[in-house]
Amino acid sequence: MPVDQEKLAKLHKLSAANKVGGTRRKINKKGNLYNNNDKDNTKLQAELHKLHPMTIENVAEANFFKKNGKVLHFNSAVVQIAPQCNLTMIHGQPKENTLNGLYPSVASQLGSQELEYLTGLAHNLENEQTVLDQLSDRCSETKQQVMNS
């Protein structure tokens, strides 16, 4: 059966004007530009609420002493404890400081055992720093000897 080209062109014009349906491309959805962890935070708060923690009032500051000599310092921290689970929670924004920076303000609040521990920790850090300095000096000396050879 022969096809009439004129009728075919006329049908193409009519079909182009009356397009049915849309384009087949996917619409790009924009994700959350500000990724808050509110969803995770609410789940965590819900789980912690199940432990029935007790809030300790009037805590001015809290400090975590790390073994590398850094201290996590919390100003105006909210402290909660759940003794049945042996759990202590500290809520707040920590600032990471050095042990030397916080030592004068913290020393008056500590007992004798804690002071001995902190002085020992500071002494160990100083010893480690001197050992690292000696090793770096030796490395630089050997590099110079290799370069001169």
From Swiss-Prot:
Q: Which UniProt keywords apply?
A: Cytoplasm, Nucleus, Protein transport, Repressor, Transcription, Transcription regulation, Transport
- Please tell me one Gene Ontology term that the record gives under cellular component: cytoplasm
Q: Which InterPro entries does the entry link to?
A: BTF3 (IPR039370), NAC_A/B_dom_sf (IPR038187), Nas_poly-pep-assoc_cplx_dom (IPR002715)
Q: What is its main location?
A: cytoplasm
List the CDD domains. NAC_BTF3
Database matches in PROSITE patterns: NAC_AB (PS51151)
Function as written in the Swiss-Prot or TrEMBL entry:
Acts as a component of the nascent polypeptide-associated complex (NAC), which promotes mitochondrial protein import by enhancing productive ribosome interactions with the outer mitochondrial membrane. Also blocks the inappropriate interaction of ribosomes translating non-secretory nascent polypeptides with translocation sites in the membrane of the endoplasmic reticulum. BTT1 may act as a transcription factor that exert a negative effect on the expression of several genes that are transcribed by RNA polymerase II.
Q: What is its quaternary makeup?
A: Part of the nascent polypeptide-associated complex (NAC), consisting of EGD2 and either EGD1 or BTT1. NAC associates with ribosomes via EGD1 or BTT1.
Protein name as catalogued: Nascent polypeptide-associated complex subunit beta-2
Recorded source organism is Saccharomyces cerevisiae (strain YJM789) (Baker's yeast)
